[in-house]
Design a protein with these regions (language model features):
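Short, conserved micro-motifs composed of acidic
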Residues: 1-209
Length: 209
């Protein structure tokens, strides 16, 4: 969320407060008032949550940290683990996920064997593309691979979300058959690990604005 929270009064180039991560808990049928996540997840610079595992123990975040030589203005993708009631300090994702290009959104499948992320690095189809790394049998991760056609276009693809069924991918794109700006699409992975042609979720989920 972008709002004054006492952590910092700094604003970005558009005059907005920096993003920070908040949480709310469901009590009975109501949600509690949002609270600022404690350190070390938030810093005085921009930090946003990208993905929280189903068991609530693993978090991917996008944050600005000038201690690392990544992305424009030091923005990269970081990971944190929950240890009891506390979170570990965010550590930058390795395996060539972060580069000097722009890496933004990220998500994982239910079993944490596939990580999808967004990058405008060289080797893509144009704009921002969806990329992935896979966990290998020896426990290490593969090199990043562009998801390619039919997922990526010459325009921007963003915000991947892997459904718990293990085969359905939701993402946003200004390409494909967008009816206006970034639309939400879905694609399914078949038994031969090929992605189906993305389907626009249509109105009223997507609009012309």
């Amino acid at each position: 969320a972008k709002k004054p929270d006492g952590l910092t009064d700094s604003k970005d180039d558009q005059g907005d407060f920096y993003e920070h991560i908040y949480y709310s808990e469901k009590v009975d049928n109501s949600w509690t008032k949002a609270k600022l996540m404690p350190n070390p997840l938030n810093t005085k610079k921009s930090t946003s949550a990208l993905y929280l595992s189903a068991d609530g123990q693993y978090l991917l975040s996008s944050m600005v940290n000038n201690d690392f030589n990544v992305g424009p203005m030091g923005r990269g993708i970081f990971e944190s683990y929950k240890n009891g009631n506390l979170w570990t300090a965010p550590q930058i994702l390795k395996n060539e996920v972060n580069t000097n290009y722009l890496e933004t959104s990220a998500s994982m499948d239910l079993n944490k064997n596939m990580l999808l992320f967004v990058s405008d690095r060289d080797g893509g189809y144009g704009g921002k593309d969806l990329w992935m790394i896979k966990k290998l049998e020896n426990g290490s991760w593969s090199l990043p691979q562009n998801l390619g056609e039919p997922i990526n276009t010459e325009y921007d693809e963003e915000s991947p979300y892997f459904h718990s069924d293990g085969k359905t991918l939701y993402f946003s794109s200004t390409g494909h058959s967008s009816i206006g700006g970034l639309d939400i699409f879905k694609s399914e992975l078949d038994l031969e690990l090929n992605w189906s042609s993305p389907k626009n979720m249509g109105y009223p989920i997507n609009t012309v604005n």
